[in-house]
Amino acid sequence: MKIKVKLPDGKEKEYDRGITPAEIAKELGVKKAIGAVVNGELWDLKRPIENDCELRLVTLEDPEAPEFYRHTMAHILAQAVMRIYGKENVKLGIGPTIENGFYYDFDIKNGKLTEEDLPKIEQEMKKIIKENLPIERKEISKEEARKLFNNQPYKLELIEEIEGDRVTIYRQGEFVDLCRGPHLPSTGVVKHFKLLSVSGAYWRGSEKNPMLTRVYGTAFAKKEDLDNYLKFLEEAQRRDHRKLGPHLELFMLNTEYAPGMPFFLPKGVVVLNELMRFSRELHRERGYQEIFTPLIMNEQLWKISGHWDHYAENMYFIEKDEERYAVKPMNCPGHILVYKSRTVSYRDLPLRFFEFGRVHRYERSGVLHGLMRVRSFTQDDAHIFCTPDQIEEEILGVLDLINTIYGQFGFTYRVELSTMPEDHMGDEAIWEKATTALKNALERAGLSYKVNEGEGAFYGPKIDFHIRDSIGREWQCATIQLDFMMPEKFNVTYIGPDNKEHRAVMIHRAIYGSLERFFGILIEHFAGAFPTWLAPIQVAVIPISEKHNDGAEKIAKRISQEGFRVFFDNRRETLGYRIRQAQTQKIPYMIILGDKELESGKISVRTRTGKEIKDVDLEHFVETLRNEVLSRKLELLMEG
């Protein structure tokens, strides 16, 4: 029986049913093929093709290639661990690819795998790569699979959850794994890898299950790319907010009493307050009204909103006086209650409510991560209530606000627009009008964007913003979401020109997103060296010796009187120690005062990067500092 295969150049060829991409690659002279994409699905090179299809061969140069070779590297890792610790002692979890790498979870009997063991595992992996073992894909019955994995409890659990009567396994040498693929043709195709770290991970992410040992690794087709990535990881570690935050006395975490709920220390609160002050200024200028809504509200509210049915497992509850309350996971229902507290005319619209609202959402302990993934956080939430005809202008205003805020921190960003999914609610004509309004606003703002067709929420289209930090990482922060569901559930209306009720449009939007997460991103973006306007301490005044204390204290008070955050460091430590500590605390400016400075009335200024500026007039320094802080400059003006 023949099948038709359509190639990327548009040509269609006939082949015998059961032909493999490897055979097609040979015919076409594509010697470097490692796999294929068949009807949009990643496909092993030796896997038979049974039906008509569109086919594209994949080489190591293609964007799909990492999925093949990193998945195979995870299997090579598991095979190496079983060789070292003994097949009978290792229970296998899962080993997927992740962004820029892979991992595998192990349950090792009578043994402990630590980061000190990674070099010997790497050596065994190199042996497996050198053996260049063929990788074979096979479909077997569930009954066969149960026998094959009879000593692998985690695999047996997975087998029972797979739909249908057959499962897929992969074999390389003595190693067999339950896996959907895709994989390389053999273990010797890609040689450049590195095991990165070891951590604990609960099976299936649940604290009720056993804790497994997770080994992370990465792999690249070229050694140069691997080396560059490892350098990138070193830089990322240097910037890790989980290390810098406590070191700079910004925040602390207490996993015993408040897991996932950060404690902000005095210096961290300074930064948070500056972020909120900056945001409030811009929101006031743009006609937003700040409100404050309760942290705990009755269960009936959450039943109306739908959170009770669809989000309860992520919520915290309180029972008092035979009434059930929920700690709010989102701010929108509260904002709707504020809107509905009075009759609204079309003349009142748009109404823009804004809140730094504290929310709580349960996250499994295994996914908590510093400030980036927490259970308690503050959202810079706003909800705009408007008429359908006002959508475009309101979105345009939000886009301008986002651009202003992100530009202040030196962030660039990319934009994604997600459109109507199949299981949407609401009239398609309204969806079409709303989506067109979003597109028009993006285009009027001069923003290029990617369209994710059918990936909007069921209750409305949305725009997502992915900011890029100083080392090129992307973070999803701002969101603009149109909502057709909440106004219907809560009967959110306004009185139109015809004196009748009309359904209002509701726009959810956040710019920082989670204030805590944005703070963590900023710590890593600036490597803890905040611009002066954000810095917890802006100036350290350091007398050279005890006899200079009085004069230095007067200068510290003079600068402090101007509203700047000053640390007068008259501790009985060496001058070198105090300067070094100011530098490690990332204080933008140090004023060093000795006989010469106090006699001349001129000061010596040293920046945190080590640049020295001598004979500076104090009032000139104060004026420069004022300009730098009021204009929220990113750079240190005294270095200019």
Curated annotation (Swiss-Prot):
Homodimer. One of its GO terms (cellular component) is cytoplasm. It is an enzyme of class 6 (ligase). Residues 240-531 are annotated as: Catalytic. Its cofactor is Zn(2+). It is found in: Cytoplasm. It catalyses: tRNA(Thr) + L-threonine + ATP = L-threonyl-tRNA(Thr) + AMP + diphosphate + H(+). Its EC number is 6.1.1.3. Zn(2+) binds at C332, H383, H508. Catalyzes the attachment of threonine to tRNA(Thr) in a two-step reaction: L-threonine is first activated by ATP to form Thr-AMP and then transferred to the acceptor end of tRNA(Thr). Also edits incorrectly charged L-seryl-tRNA(Thr). This is Threonine--tRNA ligase.
